[in-house]
Amino acid sequence: TEFSADQIEDFKEAFGLFDRIGDSQVAFNQVADIMRALGQNPTNKDVTKILGNPSADDMANKRLNFDAFLPMLKEVDALPKGTYDDYVEGLRVFDKEGNGTVMGAELRIVLSTLGEKMTEPEIDALMAGQEDEGSVHYEAFVKHIMSV
């Protein structure tokens, strides 16, 4: 993917907002958040791999500048993206009644235990306003997630 000059300027500006020290660099452990702020949705595993599988210590202490970050962003942008249909199909497996809903409690368990595990506060934020008498309409839920 080639980004336009305007996009790169926007990316650079966003990158700068994460520079807490003022040295025009960010910590390795901020890279995933910056990518997500720029509309990407990499897994933590993807980002760790792109960073060269750094140790926990390196994640906290190593820093990189925008020129090192941009090729990483391009790499993430090129990764295959899950589609609306992919997510709906994945949730349909949990639709026991075949009525377009999944149990909220079951969805919470899935989000906290499978794949890239989410924390309780992350799940609460994601599911805010999505439960209707203990059930979640998963097509609406996927639309909600994809618009966040």
From Swiss-Prot:
UniProt keyword terms in alphabetical order: Acetylation, Motor protein, Muscle protein, Myosin, Repeat
Record-listed N-acetylthreonine modification sites: 1
Cystine connections: none
GO molecular function, one term: calcium ion binding
SUPFAM superfamilies attached to this UniProt entry: EF-hand
GO cellular component assignments: contractile muscle fiber; myosin II complex
CDD domains in the record: EFh
Residue ranges constituting the EF-hand domain according to the UniProt record: 6-41, 82-117
Miscellaneous section: In fish, myosin MLC1 and MLC3 appear to be produced by two different genes unlike in birds and mammals, where they are produced from a single gene by alternative splicing.
Subunit annotation: Myosin is a hexamer of 2 heavy chains and 4 light chains.
Name used for this protein in its record: Myosin light chain 3, skeletal muscle isoform
